[in-house]
């Protein structure tokens, strides 16, 4: 699919299920519309990009599934298939004492400069 519109950067700071879930909703939605999307997780937000992510154990995950809402379980592979670039912040992993944790396949390890360069003059949404 040809990319259209300005790049979108999604900056995930929170380790909570609700914000991580919506970061994936926005990222996948924008990518489905043809936008170039970079999801950058830092600090507690890095937990979303771990393999496996502990967010799957959150009670909200089961509640969303029961209500027919796309879950993190469904959105993570969908975002990857749609071409969402996923980056875990190296400093954020260290700050959360996750430096040795396994990242999900396809997740890059980089810093904020890489994220900002990827987004360029595009939009940044912080969750």
Model-derived regions: residue spans:
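Short, flexible loop segments at the rims of nucleotide/cofactor-binding pockets, characterized by
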Residues: 16, 62-66, 102-105
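N-terminal beta-loop-helix "entrance" segment that forms/cooperates
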Residues: 45-58
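A glycine-rich helix N-cap at a beta->alpha junction
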Residues: 57-87
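Histidine-anchored nucleotide/phosphate-binding helix
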Residues: 21-33, 39
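Short internal beta-strands
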Residues: 37-43, 86-90
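Short, glycine-rich nucleotide/cofactor-binding loops
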Residues: 9-21
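N-terminal glycine-rich phosphate/adenylate-binding segment common to multiple enzyme folds
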Residues: 87-127
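Hydrophobic/aromatic ligand-binding patch that stacks against planar heteroaromatic rings
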Residues: 26-30, 78, 115
């Amino acid at each position: 699919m040809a990319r259209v519109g300005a790049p979108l950067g999604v900056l995930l700071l929170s380790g909570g299920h609700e914000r991580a879930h919506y970061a994936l909703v926005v990222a996948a939605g924008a990518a489905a519309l043809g936008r170039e999307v970079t999801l950058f997780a830092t600090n507690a937000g890095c937990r979303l990009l771990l393999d496996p992510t502990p967010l799957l154990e959150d009670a909200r995950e089961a509640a969303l599934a029961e209500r027919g809402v796309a879950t993190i379980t469904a959105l993570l592979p969908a975002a990857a298939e749609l071409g969402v670039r996923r980056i875990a912040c190296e400093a954020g992993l260290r700050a959360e004492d996750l430096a040795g944790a396994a990242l999900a396949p396809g997740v890059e390890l980089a810093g904020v400069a890489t994220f900002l360069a990827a987004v360029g003059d595009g939009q940044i949404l912080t969750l």
